Amino acid sequence: MREYNKGIFVVLNQGGPFATGDAPPSIAPFSGAGKEWVRGLKQAGLTTKYRILRNQIFEFLGVGSFADINELLNNSDRRGVVEKRAYGLLGNMFGIDGNSREIIARVNEYSRTADGVISYLKGKVLANYASYIEMTNEIDSIKSPVELLLILFDDRYHKKARFEAKRKLVLMNLAASIDQRERETDVENKFLKFLDFLNDHVWSRKTRIGELEIVYLLSKHAPENFACTEVKVIDKKNFKEVTRKPLQKLTLVKRRRFQVNGGEVPIYVSIRKKPPEAKVLKLLRKGEENPAVAVDDELGLMAVMDSVMGVKLFQRHLTRCAGRAGSLLILEEVTDTLDGGDHVSSSIGSSSQTPMFKFFARMGGMRVEFIVHTNVSYINYMYQRDVSHDEYEVKRIFDSGVAEMLFPLDIYGLEMDKIKDRLIHWFRKRIEDS
């Protein structure tokens, strides 16, 4: 599990001095509760962090003390002035070009991304617990960072709402950093350039862009671990004649083709472009504030071939295509476990039992991650016990500590260790019984 006692994440730790309490932070520093809180702050070694955060809050709100914040809560005219100034500060900090309306629109996008992180978890990994983690309506609807920040000090709001306001601010900050990094590195244009390279040089010219061949992978699975023992490719014409038996799965894939030595080789391809909320989640899982961690591996492709020989053909084909496009292609960080051996991954929740051919291709000013499977390894990636992607999604959210950080026990009443085991069991049942 990651340690979230550093950087911006420390403010979400409900076991630390920045925890959201039953009442807002006290503006009376010399009260008994205030003195006890200061002692806890010193014991945690977070005094300097507190001073930095306090100064940032004061500067953002244009106040000189916590008493001024209390006055701001009761003065709507002054809040309007503060909010207008705050958008200007955010625009300059994150390098957002444009007038005030354009800056507000961009910040609103960060708000939608922050809400999207929670919606993604509520709709997928934690779908069985959606009613438990549903966001307070007022927090869901507020987009203004000033309004969200003031809620932290407003006694009218319940503890859960104040925590969610703070959480939303943290997620918005990460979304803004990622957006700034993407603009600096021109990721969007690089992605379009990557697609052009594939369409112009890699895929067969005998098919039109977007033209895909539907086939089905009929796989047999071992009862002890649901590993794939055999797989057959079934074309669309013969699909209706297939009757599945116990321990069999039928998986639809849409394949393209590339040309090698005058022949056409089929390949299933999934091109990765992470949505903003997925990038924020990656920073959370890694316990990182540096947006490069989420952005710099933005470009990626997963491919599935009929055999190991097909995988090697595709790798050589890529190298030749890059040359025809006027660029060398250099393979970096190559991992090949399709012929045996374990894949060593630093990612929390990932399995070393997942065979793959993985590398980063540096070409044409881009660095693209490629993960290439055979039909068998892809089926295992989808369905094998302790390996499947659904299990991996659950494990990395829970084992990294993200679930507990975003939905702490004292606010949501969810015991994450027990929930993790239940969810993995539920996903396994859905995979093996469907």
How would you name each of these model-derived features?
Residues 1-294, 397-434:
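Charge-rich, low-complexity segments
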